[in-house]
Regions:
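Flexible loop/turn segments at secondary-structure boundaries
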Residues: 53-54, 75-78, 111-113
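Conserved cytochrome P450 K-helix/beta-meander segment immediately N-terminal to the heme-binding cysteine loop
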Residues: 70-97, 105
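Cytochrome P450 heme-thiolate "Cys pocket" and heme-binding signature region
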Residues: 92-169
């Protein structure tokens, strides 16, 4: 939620002509998915194969080996998400067969049980905005933007210094009337 709020408000600063996008819930959901791709809640996933498997780096993992998947790096892969993969682009198109939020919610039997609750259902071209399932993150952001929330200019946000992960430790907002 905080990463998406920050990404969108910074994006609007450099794209002021797109400010009205923040009142479109489909746009907000796409922005939430893009932000989730860039800022997965867990930067890695651990898996153990149930049989020997050949990895993409041509190494073989044996049954029971611990395989660490670097989600942070995978979600920023330029071959998968384009030359600007490390940047926030709420209009990014997902590669064929891929999710707009990358691997942030996992896949298959290891997918996050709360994905649809938090992120909603990925919108399609013909999605009806009136009955679409947006997810809680989008709905909260929609209300924040409707009420003119913005970062507090007198009390700037601060990163969490207790972790190496790029997370916000403090992010005050104000409502402009």
């Amino acid at each position: 939620l905080v990463h998406t709020f920050h990404e969108v408000t910074m994006w609007i600063e450099i794209n002021p002509d797109k400010k009205n996008c923040i009142f479109d819930p489909i746009f907000i959901q796409k922005a939430a998915h893009e932000s989730t791709r860039l800022h997965p809640s867990s930067p890695v996933a651990w898996r153990k194969p149930t049989c020997p498997v050949q990895l993409p780096n041509n190494k073989e993992a044996k049954e029971g080996d611990k395989i660490i998947v670097d989600l942070y790096t995978c979600n920023r892969d330029e071959e998968m998400f384009g030359e600007d993969a490390k940047q926030f682009n709420p209009f990014r198109k997902a590669p064929s067969g891929q999710n707009t939020y990358g691997l942030s919610f996992g896949l298959g039997m290891h997918s996050c049980i709360g994905r649809n609750l938090a992120a909603g259902v990925v919108p399609k071209e013909d999605t009806n905005p009136e009955d679409h399932h947006y997810g809680t993150v989008t709905l909260i952001l929609k209300k924040l933007f409707e009420n003119k929330a913005m970062p507090n200019p007198d009390d700037p946000p601060k990163m969490d210094e207790k972790t190496k992960r790029p997370n916000w430790g403090y992010y005050p907002i104000v409502f402009d009337r």
